[in-house]
Amino acid sequence: MNFSKRIVLSALAGTVLATPAFAQDQSGETAADDNVIIVTAQRRAQDVQDIPLAVTAVSPVQLERQGVVSVTQIGQVSASFSSSNAQTAGGTNVLRIRGVGTTSNNIGFESAVGIFIDGAYQSRPGVALSEFVDVERLEVLRGPQGTLFGRNTSAGALNITTKRPDLNEFGGFVNATYGNYDNIGIQGAVNVPLIQDTLAARLTGAYRKRDGFVRVINETGEIGRTNELDQFLVRGQLGYESDGGVKVRLIFDYSEVNGNCCAPVEVLKSGLETGGVFAASGLGATGGQLVPAATTPNDTAGLNAALDGLTASQSLVQTSNLDQWGITGEIEFPLSDSADLIYIGSYRDFNSGNTGDSDFTTLDLFHVGNFDGGNRDIGTNIKTMTHELRVQGEAFDGKLDWLIGAYYSDEDIDSSGFSQLGTQWDQFVGALLQGSAGPAPIALFSGGLNPAGSNATNRFTQNSKSWSIFTHNTLEIVDGLKATIGLRYSDESKDGAFQQLNSNPGACGGIVNNVAGGPLAAGQPRIPGALVPTLLITGCFPFVAPADLAASAVLPLPRTFNGNFSDEELIYTGKLAYEFADPITIYGSFTHGYKSGGFNLDSTAAIGGADPRFASEEVDAYEIGLKAKFLDNAVTLNVAAFIEEFSNFQVLEFTGAQFQTFNVPKAESTGVEIESTIRPSENLTFNMALTYTDAKYPNDCATAADALRVQNLCGAALTNAPKYVAIGGATYRGDIGDSMRFFLNGQIRMESDRRTSTQPSTPPTTAAALGNTPLLPFDVQDGNIKINLRAGIGDIDDAWGIEAWVTNLTNEITRGVTFSTTLRGGSRSAFPQEPRMYGLTLRGKF
């Protein structure tokens, strides 16, 4: 379905639409303080309508209404936010704001959208995958936020605040959910005052288990499911407040996210399959892909049938396991009646691991994980420590709101992975060469060596240290006119290394000897020149090839590395805001933001002598906005227009055989955002949000001196950046007699077409081919509409409630990532997004 501007605007004009109430709703569904929404987007508690910043604030009620239980689902409540996921739960989540994010399957890449939970930075999206429960507020801060939030917020930030312990009242809640795919969820919290008005404890927990929605099959039938949930979280807090105003909050949490995640669905068949090459090579008619799919790039019916079938062909079911624990401490110490000292410190230990089939077929070709039973520590560990100290307050009778602070973080990454070739690898390479070199070309050209069992255990380490000093100050120059100046000096240093713990080279040595012109065994032929590239990359497959062979100096083979990256940057912002009527404010701002560079932590990073480092990303952002309320605060309207210009934009792409990192000299995002809430009565609320975003690589994004893969991006839209997104819905609530109440809620989310791959077309091999290479098939996800509905009934005091709900009512199957299937000659595969979900939720409060 293709959407144009006219279609989106017509739909908005013709239908009363609404997004979630952007934190308008409070406990018990009643508005408070004339709909004042308090946020901490500027590190102070402020009315969201008073700050010169584009921010969407979402209440816990609205998160529940739209079924948002993790950061990956925030796009359901924010039109400017999106996320996508690929093969693993912990390492391939990509978050985007205004179409900008860091596409990555690499632990060395850091997100362009920073995540902060209770003021503490979460270093990777995978670290923040635990369930949303007992949340006080979610803030989506749009645009670069580096002045106050620091590192890696070049696209924006998520500021998540959990509920604090209540020093006075005992209470809590319990929620229980059951839905399709055997979706079982339990959430709860209990608050216990230990010393009245002084000390309290709060314990929060959540458990969720759901079957996967993608079937995994081989020749024997279904062998499992992926895209499942199996997770739990426990969080304990202590809150303290002295008579003198000293406040202390200590938070400990532990969580696990397990299950099978995630399997791609083949959407376009390889020409080797449709041409009968796999069959002729003894690999079966389909070459290990058992599910019908499109046979040509124009076969949209085949594409849709493949996606709707939600079935993947694999020899193993992908598994992912995450566990982490962390501690956060916050101290607020009053220095005077107008100044406070605030400290936030955190420590987090995160572990993840995954095993699975990386060729995405039922053939025995290529796997990752500890399959050999060896005593190797396989997986990723990230230890992160952060400290932030701020002094802030007011001066000149409240005319000046000032803040100064310092920040330090220390992070250690230790990531090891085991990869191995399977028994059918050589036969598969023979099919890739369409029989021109016989049924087992690697054995032929390596002197009889079998590549089956070739494996390597690769280890990547990185230590990152960052420190900064910052200030953020707002001065009311005259009544209604405020100026804000923010500065942050940031210093980053990283030590990154790749070492190979173990390697079984298999046939690689024989292939290298052949290519390098070494002596041949009796009957061993020399590799023809035309076949050298294919035989080298398949005989020495980069993920299993031995590192630092003598031939690595001249051939594209893995090399270990041990290096240093350092950078410093001055981040700054300037804003002017004018309140020309009590509820109406206009503002303009400029912000210079920054995201640190670092290391491509991958075995292919230094192939051919390449520099494994990538440069820091910078952004200059311009924004003007309007924040207004009308009709006795019954109508809220917020509008923002923005231009964001990126330099050294960080990109990672998978070529089908290796991961490549590079910086694109230019990228940009421009657009307009509109959010509005209308309350015609106490019982009825309408909200709407519309985002227009033109996020792209400009036509002059690179020069002739840049690599062809960089030049090829010029003129293309950024990945997963639809031009139009509209979210809307309505909520009606009413009483049933004197003891019960009910509500009805509906939401619709529409988006226009979006690209789902890094490259828009087949990467050119020569400069002359730029602009003439064919578009990659099925790169574009068509525009779509998704509808959520929820209805509930319960006690008027919220003592109990029952709700029925459905998300993605029409079962619209979309895809977040589309890629060229590993070494499969033109095949394309995609990771499908969540289908229709429905169920019942019971709520109790005490």
Spans of model-derived segments:
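Gram-negative outer-membrane beta-barrel transporters
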Residues: 27-28, 399, 405, 479, ...
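Structural signature of Gram-negative outer-membrane beta-barrels, strongest in the C-terminal barrel
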Residues: 239-241, 405-409, 460-644
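Membrane-embedded beta-barrel scaffold of Gram-negative outer-membrane proteins
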Residues: 330-334, 340-346, 351-358, 579-602, ...
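Periplasmic-side early beta-strands and strand-to-turn transitions of outer-membrane beta-barrels
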Residues: 159, 168-169, 175-177, 189, ...
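C-terminal beta-signal and adjacent terminal beta-strands/loops
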Residues: 748-767, 793-846
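Outer-membrane beta-barrel translocator/receptor signature
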Residues: 110-112, 124, 133-142, 147-234, ...
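N-terminal Sec signal peptide and the immediately downstream disordered periplasmic leader
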Residues: 1-66, 72-76, 234, 245, ...
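Acidic, small-polar-rich N-terminal luminal/periplasmic segments of exported/outer-membrane proteins
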Residues: 33-167, 624
